[in-house]
Amino acid sequence: MASELDNLPVITTRREEAQGFLQGLVSKGLGWARKYSLFQYPFVTACCGMEFMTVASARYDLDRFGAALPRFSPRQADLLIVVGTVNCKQAPILRRVYEQIAEPKWVVAFGVCASSGGFYDNYATVQGIDRIVPVDVYIPGCPPRPEQVLDGIMLLQQKIQGQQHKLIDRKPLPVVGQEPISR
Ligand code: SF4
């Protein structure tokens, strides 16, 4: 005689399927919302800053990507844009700023100096900020044209939309200063 317990695996599977379906919808919705509400923290160190200001001007209209408003506190930002050359003395400061941004967060390397050290191939310059923080999008150029920056922002939006987003993320809290560089 069949008991109630015989049905449990099927019920569990259906519940898991439903949860997976709902999680997929939530993830898609959160991804859509997050990719259009990027609050950038510009970490500007060098000449690329002039081009960064151009991108922020009305002509290129960053607002249509939901990324117009810079935040000057990492606690209010979710997108760290590193603009320009980073030297070894600045490296711990950059890492500290990254750690102060709440999850979920993303990083863009703006220009060849931030991406790879550029032509400053010397002992004092960090040869790419991915040695200090994980980078989501690299924008080439010295300095990059505003169109390249917009292209980079759109690439980042695609990446955000494709990521898994949860309403509540139960990851253990990191110990400040001891997190690994990769995510
Ligand atoms: S990439 Fe070129 S413009 Fe940008 S900070 Fe380096 S040297 Fe300056």
UniProtKB/Swiss-Prot annotation:
InterPro entries: NADH_UbQ_OxRdtase-like_20kDa, NADH_UQ_OxRdtase_20Kd_su
Alphabetically ordered keywords of this record: 4Fe-4S, Cell inner membrane, Cell membrane, Iron, Iron-sulfur, Membrane, Metal-binding, NAD, Quinone, Translocase, Transport, Ubiquinone
Any one GO CC term of the record: plasma membrane
Catalytic reactions on record: a quinone + NADH + 5 H(+)(in) = a quinol + NAD(+) + 4 H(+)(out)
Subcellular location: Cell inner membrane
Alphabetized SUPFAM superfamilies for the sequence: HydA/Nqo6-like (SSF56770)
Membrane topology: Peripheral membrane protein
The record's free-text note on cofactor binding: Binds 1 [4Fe-4S] cluster.
A GO biological process held by the record: electron transport coupled proton transport
Enzyme Commission designation: 7.1.1.-
Keyword Iron-sulfur listed: yes
Cofactor dependency: [4Fe-4S] cluster
GO molecular function, one term: iron ion binding
Residues that, per the record, bind [4Fe-4S] cluster: C47, C48, C113, C142
Cited function: NDH-1 shuttles electrons from NADH, via FMN and iron-sulfur (Fe-S) centers, to quinones in the respiratory chain. The immediate electron acceptor for the enzyme in this species is believed to be ubiquinone. Couples the redox reaction to proton translocation (for every two electrons transferred, four hydrogen ions are translocated across the cytoplasmic membrane), and thus conserves the redox energy in a proton gradient.
Subunit structure: NDH-1 is composed of 14 different subunits. Subunits NuoB, C, D, E, F, and G constitute the peripheral sector of the complex.
Family under the similarity heading: Belongs to the complex I 20 kDa subunit family.
Protein name listed in UniProt: NADH-quinone oxidoreductase subunit B 2
Species assigned in the record: Anaeromyxobacter sp. (strain Fw109-5)
Lineage: Bacteria, Pseudomonadati, Myxococcota, Myxococcia, Myxococcales
